[in-house]
Design a protein with these regions (language model features):
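Extreme N-terminal leader/targeting segments of oxidoreductases
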Residues: 1-37, 55
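N-terminal Rossmann-like FAD-binding beta1-loop-alpha1 element of flavoenzymes
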Residues: 36-61
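Active-site substrate-recognition segment that forms the wall
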Residues: 51-56, 63-65, 78-79, 84, ...
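Dinucleotide-binding Rossmann-like beta1-alpha1 core, especially the glycine-rich loop
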Residues: 78-160, 164, 321-323
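Helix-loop-beta segment of a Rossmann-like dinucleotide-binding subdomain
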Residues: 117-130, 142, 149, 154-200, ...
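Helical element adjacent to the flavin cofactor pocket in flavoenzyme catalytic cores
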Residues: 176-226, 230
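C-terminal catalytic lobe of FAD-dependent flavoproteins
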Residues: 326-417
Length: 417
């Protein structure tokens, strides 16, 4: 359940999360035939798009209301769980998540090479555990549904689950193994994408929110920030849960995105003797082990707007759910707690592609799949900006699918720039 949006953290002295450093880079050649592009939002989605476009020769400027990568891209758990997160009604989304999952190994290597920063890609896989008979019945139902979609998952006994993860509670009754649902260190990914984008020639402005989108004659003209006006041929709206907060966009064209609050915490394991190797999905929540010894515990799902309060009840639910599966966590120190906001759409699928306003491109609403969908979103949105053709993979996720009065195809054509 990845949180793409805003994060507010409470940290103990035991953890001091790395900050993303923005560096001046040598000038890169910008093609006069490429559209000048502004990306609104410096989360992993916006940074991935900016990197791809800058590599292709576009002049790219990224604006963010906070620090680059420090919204809920920072708050996410980094799970790449295309299989085990698929629920009934999400069959269309599955095609996109599987495609992005397939891209991830090469994408991780490419980002690392471009940035010089490791992204912590791990391929041990995911285990979903059932702790009671009722849990096992629900897990069997979900397993049969996912298996019926052709997903590469395996039903295993509780004993086999404990063989793979000895610190699981002895009473684990059954489990599902998903070997291709991997993980990435999302905070490192955000740092790496910011660096890669800058090295490719993009400019990133932190703590500089876009106040207004300038539109004239049905066409994007640029954006207005605290620093002034920035003309642009294309504006990519990738502001997560804040994608409706920008003035100047006519109401029918605002993406129907809302914040979905998630509370999370991290425990501190001994890196030399971690309690877990796999990502472990619980009946209520999940555990994600990091190589640095952090054990990420998540996450609540709350319709509370932009309330960024960490609550006793939220933490209790997370810790109790984790303890029921892995009792050994009770001696671990709490390293950090935080809140993030997933950008949810009406159908919990992303909104990707032309908005109906010439030059305004939407890339938001990724809900719990923002980290997973970063490679395919960056690839498809940059392809559209450069070619003017909507990739087939994006058509089911058009921003106009909710019935807003906008054309199915945008009139934007890079060839006309």
């Amino acid at each position: 359940m990845n949180l793409v949006g805003h994060a507010r953290r409470r940290e103990s002295a035991i953890t001091a999360p790395d900050r993303i450093s923005l560096h001046r880079v040598s000038p890169h050649r910008v093609s006069p035939h490429r559209p000048k592009t502004v990306v609104v939002g410096a989360g992993v989605i916006g940074l991935g798009i900016a990197w791809r476009l800058a590599k292709a020769g576009c002049a790219v400027t990224v604006y963010d209301r906070g620090a680059a990568g420090h919204g809920a891209s920072w708050a996410a758990a980094g799970m790449l769980a295309a299989a085990v997160e698929t629920e009934p009604g999400e069959e269309t989304l599955l095609g996109l998540t599987l495609e992005s999952q397939r891209l991830w190994p090469d994408f991780a290597r490419e980002v690392e090479a471009a940035s010089g920063i490791g992204v912590g890609y791990r391929d041990e896989g995911t285990i979903v555990v059932a702790l009671t008979r009722d849990d096992a019945e629900q897990l069997r139902f979900t397993y049969e549904f996912q298996k019926g979609l052709g997903l590469a998952i395996e039903w295993v006994s509780g004993a086999e689950a404990r063989r793979r993860e000895p610190h699981l509670r002895p009473g684990v009754s059954a489990a599902v193994l998903s070997p291709y649902d991997h993980q990435v260190e999302n905070r490192a990914l955000a740092r790496a994408l910011a660096m890669a984008a800058q090295r490719a020639g993009a400019t990133i402005h932190e703590h500089c929110p876009v106040r207004e989108l300038e539109i004239g004659g049905g066409q994007v003209r640029g954006v207005v920030t605290a620093q002034g006006r920035d003309p642009a041929d294309v504006v990519v709206l990738a502001a997560g849960a804040w994608s409706r907060e920008i003035a100047g966009i006519p109401a029918p064209y605002l993406p129907p995105v809302r914040p979905i609050k998630g509370q999370m915490l991290a425990l501190r394991m001994d890196p030399a003797a971690p309690l877990l190797r796999h990502v472990v999905w619980l009946p209520r929540g999940y555990l994600v082990p990091r190589r640095d010894g952090r054990l990420v515990v998540g996450g609540t799902v709350e319709e509370r707007g932009f309330d960024d309060t960490v609550t006793a009840g939220g933490l209790l639910a997370l810790i109790e759910g984790a303890w029921r599966a892995v009792p050994a966590i009770e001696e671990l120190p709490v390293a950090e707690t935080w809140v993030g906001f997933r950008p949810g759409s009406r159908d919990d699928a992303p909104m990707l592609g032309p908005s109906g306003i010439d030059g305004l491109v939407v890339a938001t609403g990724h809900h719990r799949n923002g980290i997973l969908l970063t490679p395919v979103t960056a690839q498809a949105i940059s392809s559209y900006v450069l070619s003017g053709r909507v990739p087939d993979s994006l058509r089911p996720f058009s921003p106009d699918r909710f019935g807003s009065p906008r054309p199915a195809e945008a009139v934007f054509s890079p060839a006309a720039q």
